[in-house]
Amino acid sequence: MSQSNNVTDLARANIRALTPYMSARRLGGNGDVWLNANEYPLGTEYQLTTQTFNRYPECQPKHVIERYAAYAGLPPEQVLVSRGADEGIELLIRAFCEPGQDAILFCPPTYGMYAVSAETFGVERRTVPAQADWQLDLPAIANNLEQVKVIYVCSPNNPTGNLINPADLQAVLALAQGRAIVAIDEAYIEFCPQASVSNWLKDYPNLVILRTLSKAFALAGLRCGFTLANSDIIQLLLKVIAPYPLSTPVADIAAQALSPKGIEQMRQRVSEVRANRAWLQSALQDCACVEQVFTSESNYLLARFTASSSVFNALWDQGIILRDQNKQPGLANCLRITIGTRQECERVIAALAPLPGIDNSNNIDNQNKTYSQTSSIRKGTI
């Protein structure tokens, strides 16, 4: 083995070539209206009730597991808690995929961490693009299952906001029976709880459901997520999870959020978000620069603009930070807008209202050239 003076040459080749996930915080910005990460716009206050910081926490804090199990309508042995749902995504790859041999499958446009997690572990990323209506292409999935061990499906899907047809989810579970785990990412399910598939766990041993406290529970900064699955899968994941995934303060606050009072507050937030989403969707349709607003079952809206780069930068310059989706398959000229407070939604509309529509596309194209250098550091694509 030849020696190198560059320590980075010692890293795995796939890591050296890896493009990391561009989170909203990594992209940065100096705005005061943050509508790019699907967070709840207002903070929630908690007081720590546990002070035993000199002791290591439980691997799976009992009070958190029991409260989430009760909330989800499942026995505790079917629940695992982790550092956000993102860790749950990784745990499935670590437990089920042989690096350099197995693959995961997902259907873009969708959440970007499935791809990044697989690449990090040296696992093939196999994509089956969604159909024009963003539903699953079942024949194509059936033709691409060779060596696939985990299939990720996000419903409601991020960034499109649509629910996946439940009959199609059942078809994928049947196709994957005995071959692959099917992980349904329900990060946004609190905004449409009737669409959850958690009651399917008794019928599908290969079903896994990913959940989080980051969205409707307004705890994105806490980093607390859940994996729901049959107990055999939970036991496998416990073999590969870190020994202390949740710190004592995180477990304390998570348990409070999952109390009856905390759940009621969450549902009030969901009601507020839905009302603001309806208002924003209606108002966007009256903006000349907006070509289409897509129906959403989540806490964000996807919209197609006449010239999204100009729109993105115009709002950025006014301190309103959105999420650019142009590089996702089928999402040319699309921006994703998190549902903020009513005041924040009104600021978005006030900023969009004077922007020209399709009849002034030449002017917009000229603006795009002006913005081309700055936009490359401003945009997130996932």
From Swiss-Prot:
GO molecular function terms noted in the UniProt entry: histidinol-phosphate transaminase activity; pyridoxal phosphate binding
Organism of derivation: Yersinia pestis
PANTHER family: HISTIDINOL-PHOSPHATE AMINOTRANSFERASE, HISTIDINOL-PHOSPHATE AMINOTRANSFERASE-RELATED
Listed cofactors: pyridoxal 5'-phosphate
Pathway of action: Amino-acid biosynthesis; L-histidine biosynthesis; L-histidine from 5-phospho-alpha-D-ribose 1-diphosphate: step 7/9
Modified residues (N6-(pyridoxal phosphate)lysine): 215
Organism ancestry: Bacteria, Pseudomonadati, Pseudomonadota, Gammaproteobacteria, Enterobacterales
Keyword annotations: Amino-acid biosynthesis, Aminotransferase, Histidine biosynthesis, Pyridoxal phosphate, Transferase
Protein name (database record): Histidinol-phosphate aminotransferase
InterPro entries given in the database record: Aminotrans_II_pyridoxalP_BS, Aminotransferase_I/II_large, HisP_aminotrans, PyrdxlP-dep_Trfase, PyrdxlP-dep_Trfase_major, PyrdxlP-dep_Trfase_small
One GO BP annotation of this record: L-histidine biosynthetic process
Domain of life: Bacteria
Protein EC: 2.6.1.9
Subunit structure: Homodimer.
Substrates-to-products reaction catalysed: L-histidinol phosphate + 2-oxoglutarate = 3-(imidazol-4-yl)-2-oxopropyl phosphate + L-glutamate
Family, similarity comment: Belongs to the class-II pyridoxal-phosphate-dependent aminotransferase family. Histidinol-phosphate aminotransferase subfamily.
UniProt keyword annotation of Metal-binding present: no
Renumbered residue ranges of the record's region Disordered: 363-382
